[in-house]
């Protein structure tokens, strides 16, 4: 429908290379997920690089507004398993994980680009990190001292405006039409 109606939408598939307990190549005959959009054009990007992601999405927005839907596969990496029962090291080596952390980590790559292009100095980045850590510590301390929320708080600041649907009452469980 998106292709038929040329909807301005980008479908994003985050490919972290592993399903639960197995590599993609062992679970799919075609791991080029971007090609599965049928008539929707698609491509793959290196989502470990934040600048590539930013520039791709700026371009994708303009493309979708003019041309219609687009399918983008984000090639990224999952450092950890899915759960306690999936330690994430039975189907890949610790060396592989370490290699990605050391050479392909998005935060590390971004820092390197900022410094290499003279957009920031190492000192400036350390100050930013220090400020972020301080802000987080303050927020955590505040939250730990806040009272526990009550059951009634669960509904605070929650609003629902139900759309009018002909033949349906507001509780969405009973029809308001008459039978004869």
Task: Tell me the role of every PLM-derived stretch.
Residues 1-145:
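Glycine-rich ThDP/TPP pyrophosphate-binding loop and its adjacent helix/strand module
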Residues 144-180:
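C-terminal intrinsically disordered, low-complexity extensions immediately downstream
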């Amino acid at each position: 429908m998106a292709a038929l109606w040329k909807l301005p939408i980008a479908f994003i598939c985050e490919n972290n290379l592993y399903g639960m307990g197995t590599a993609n190549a062992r679970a799919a005959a075609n791991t080029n997920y971007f090609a599965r959009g049928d008539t929707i054009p698609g491509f793959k990007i290196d989502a470990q690089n934040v600048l590539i992601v930013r520039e791709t999405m700026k371009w994708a927005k303009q493309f979708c507004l003019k041309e219609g839907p687009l399918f983008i596969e984000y090639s990224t990496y999952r450092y950890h398993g899915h759960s306690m029962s999936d330690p994430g090291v039975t189907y890949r080596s610790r060396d592989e994980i370490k290699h990605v952390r050391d050479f392909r980590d998005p935060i590390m790559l971004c820092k390197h680009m900022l410094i290499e292009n003279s957009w920031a100095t190492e000192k400036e980045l350390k100050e930013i990190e220090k400020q972020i850590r301080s802000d987080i510590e303050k927020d955590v301390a505040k939250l730990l001292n806040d009272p526990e929320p009550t059951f009634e708080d669960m509904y605070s600041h929650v609003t629902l405006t139900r759309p009018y649907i002909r033949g349906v009452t507001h509780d969405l469980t009973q029809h308001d039409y008459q039978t004869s």
